[in-house]
């Protein structure tokens, strides 16, 4: 009976140790994707949005005209794709 208790205790202790090691390595790996994403999506001066003379899709069209291929929705005042009944 003692051998069975000892083997169960060692098995349980091994599983706990395995869990701790996996958790520690996973927490270190979590920093890598954050660093990678922050370097990929870093916004510099080169990537600023240009100001257009026309409004694009789902942009307000109160003051600006919609770009070609879009129409101003009379209900929402957004630039939307033209539907067959709007032509």
From Swiss-Prot:
Molecular function per GO: ion channel inhibitor activity; toxin activity
One Pfam family hit: Toxin_12
Keywords noted in UniProt: Disulfide bond, Ion channel impairing toxin, Knottin, Secreted, Signal, Toxin
A Gene Ontology cellular-component term: extracellular region
Disulfide bonds: 54-67, 61-72, 66-79
Record localization: Secreted
Residues spanning the signal sequence: 1-24
Expression across tissues: Expressed by the venom gland.
Any coiled-coil regions, as ranges: none
Pro-sequence residue ranges: 25-52
Record remark on domains: The presence of a 'disulfide through disulfide knot' structurally defines this protein as a knottin.
Homology family: Belongs to the neurotoxin 10 (Hwtx-1) family. 51 (Hntx-8) subfamily. Hntx-8 sub-subfamily.
Role of this protein: Ion channel inhibitor.
Annotated protein name in UniProt: U3-theraphotoxin-Hhn1a 4
């Amino acid at each position: 009976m003692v051998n069975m208790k000892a083997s169960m205790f060692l098995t349980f202790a091994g599983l706990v140790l395995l869990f701790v090691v996996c958790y520690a390595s996973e927490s270190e790996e979590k920093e890598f994707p954050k660093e990678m994403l922050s370097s990929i999506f870093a916004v510099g001066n080169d990537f600023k949005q240009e100001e257009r003379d026309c409004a694009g899709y789902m942009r307000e069209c109160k003051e600006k005209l919609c770009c070609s291929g879009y129409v101003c929705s009379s209900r929402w005042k957004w630039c939307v794709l033209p539907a067959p009944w709007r032509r």
